[in-house]
Amino acid sequence: MHKRLFTIMSLAVIFAMLLAGCAQGGGGKTLKIVSSLPMTGASLTQTQTMVNAMQLRLDQAGGKVCGGDYTVTYEAWDDASAALGKWDPAVETENANKAAADKSIIAYLGTFNSGAAALSIPILNQAGPLAMISPANTYPGLTHAAAGLTEANEPDVYYPSGTRNYARVAATDDYQGPVAAKFLVSLGVKTVYILDDQEVYGKGVADSVNQAAVANGITVIAQEGFDTKAADYKALMTKISTSNGGGPPDAIYVGSIIDNNAAQVLKDKVAIMGDNTKVKFVGPDGIYTAALIEGAGVEVAEGVFATTPGLAKKDLGEAGKKFYADYEAKFGATNEPYAVMGYDAMNAAIKALEDVCAAGGDPSDRAAVTKAVFAIKDFAGALGTWSFDANGDITLPYFLIGQVQAGAFVDFGTFVP
């Protein structure tokens, strides 16, 4: 009887060990990387390519790090809600708290919206800290002070532990504004009317353009926030059409994400002031997406200019060109510029894990991984060779400018401030 019981118990132990082995993917522990991006709403056109690129990079690593001793899994979380049709503060806060509580998560790739990052950075900062790598945030105050653009308590307010845990592969709006302003000058623009969606990102980039436009001799007629839930903007556009001494400005700049009715703003601008050769329509990375063209219509969107962090495809090195070829082979071709940002965000996470192991550390140690992220220097990524500085900012202040031509954004070139 005792012998039979012993045999049954032994088999149970062996079975449990086999299950554990399967769960760990053939040896070693399992680590988890998550992304938190708006996967509901118009931004999906941009964010799906980032998620695809993140998965592509992990697949290229075979889902393993540290010589195969650790399995790495990836989950794409949505920080948007159907109710808002865009990123939702409540959902992003929930995501950050969920990640903080799950000790298997060693990197949080996000966010897409700067306002979302302002909520999640402090939560993750007190959870290890847990490394956060954004493929897209451009508001400077998340990492550094910028005169006239950031609040007095930024960025320290986001790091209650006193240790930095947030880095990003996107250049910031204190660079994006000057790039846009200098480009406007090159187009012969002398007067501009600036609109913003009143969010951290949209107002922030609009403020930067305002500041840079004045510095470059452009007259800013006004800057105002618009109601993102309005049915139309014909009254607003009618007002703007006579704001320049009875006539229209040379250009309208719209600091907004696509989810905040940017396509409707464009439609009503064209309806009241004519096509984009008459009064130029310019915006930032938040509208640099096929969703703008789909929402406004091909004819209406023709001629729109937009800036976005990164390099024109023709200016990418071999690693960047290989990324787009690999992406196309797996998911189909894309012109969304944030795809490569997603790839290098995952690149940075994998690099940090490998570096922790190479130093004899434990890649499940959040503090060690965070330290390794900030130690990334002269990394050969898809964007080129880059580093993270002490603030967590990427050392590539490059922006590409695109113009809508025949229903698609076409690279107009790479620009620096």
What are these model-predicted stretches?
Residues 147, 266-343, 411-416:
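Extracellular/periplasmic periplasmic-binding protein-like sensory domains
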Residues 327-339, 350-411:
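Segments of small-molecule ligand-sensing domains
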Residues 35, 99-112, 130-135, 193-196, ...:
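Periplasmic-binding protein-like
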Residues 24-35, 65-71, 185-190:
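Immediate post-signal peptide segment of exported/extracytoplasmic ligand-binding proteins
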Residues 26-28, 45-49, 64-154, 169, ...:
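Beta-alpha junction/loop-to-helix N-cap segments that form part of ligand/metal-binding clefts
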Residues 34-57, 61, 65, 77-89, ...:
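Extracytoplasmic "Venus flytrap"
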Residues 1-32, 66, 100, 416-417:
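Short, low-complexity disordered leader/linker segments with a strong preference
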Residues 106-224, 280-302:
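Extracytoplasmic ligand/sensor domains, especially the bilobed periplasmic-binding protein
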